[in-house]
Amino acid sequence: MLALLASPSSILKTATKPDTDIVEALKDIANKNNPVAIVSNNPKPNWFDEAFNLSKVVFVRAKGRQSGQFIKDVAKKHNMPTSNFLCLTATDEDYMMGKNGQAILIAAGWSNNAKAKSLGIQVANASELKEVFELTNNWPGSWWFTGNSPSYGVRALADLSSYGAGADQVSFSQKVTNTVKQGGGRLNALLTITSRSLLLEWGGEKKGVFFGVYPSSDPTKFNDEVLTDFTHRLRTTVSRVRYADRSEPLFIRHTASPKRSKGQGGDRTDPTSQVTTLHLNPSYAQSIRGKDVIIIDDCTTYGLSFGVAAAFLAAAGASSMTGIALGKFGSRLEHYHITLNSDPFAPVKASDFTLVEHTSLPGKTAVGAQNALHELVP
């Protein structure tokens, strides 16, 4: 169950009059038995009772709400994670309440507040707010797949085999691209469920996390990845610290590699064509050390991308790596133990790495998670 928190400022159209569309959206969400509260440091505004008459929207005066303690107390009382709270954000106080309370912040797109505008999840209007809430509310709150190898972890939001026999990585990748490029409610819901899954696993905000994207096989797409924008938005949702610059990718593809999802490149468990065509960005040689790194990819089958990324990051001194795929095909995921014998921030020759072994990477699955993704990436 999700709860939606807003403040008087986030729904006001003028200084004394709330936006009727936003009010109706909140009432509609609340009347479907979802907790909705207007939270403020100040007493209940004069317009509240009339605006929310005959609805289940409640007003809560929480002095010092910026500390986020209000969210933590309610979460504890009802035995629910703080990541189940969506906080509509239009002011600095809203931002602080949500961040300190370890909730999911959703920017009110009609606000000019700088902190709100910096958030990765933004709704443009009342209709989009409802859509994001409803799509996200269908998500059971966990990864579809969770697996851990001796040297890195793999997470996936959904089982892509459930798309049908004709599904493949190319078509799903295009679906993800379309969803991200089109923006709107589906993108924001996709960001929200990914953020919730991370925060649930972490038990709240985690410090020292570095976010990156596994690069395209095409070197001309230098940081022009659809997933780059998705990852930037995700980072701003679950973390307050930015270790990577939006304009500087973590990995650099210096030479084109075979498009494995299109059947190119032969043995899809052989890392040679990947290891020898990319390297880490030297700009991060110092900042990557000791960090827990999250690598985002659209989908995975054999898991080779994550194995290669883990090898480079281990050589660079990263503390850990978790690969997150929006989807996973089949049951052929493997763990790759790869060691680099050269500088991970420069091109690596085939003679400068060793594939020690690759073995099956088992994990746990949560069946209920996959259906929700079909709504977000149709």
List the model feature ranges, each with a label.
Residues 1-20:
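Metal-dependent phosphoesterase signature
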Residues 71-93, 292-295:
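Conserved Lys-Pro-Asp/Glu-containing loop-to-beta segment of HAD-superfamily phosphomonoesterases
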Residues 135-210, 219-221, 253-285:
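Active-site-facing substrate-recognition patch
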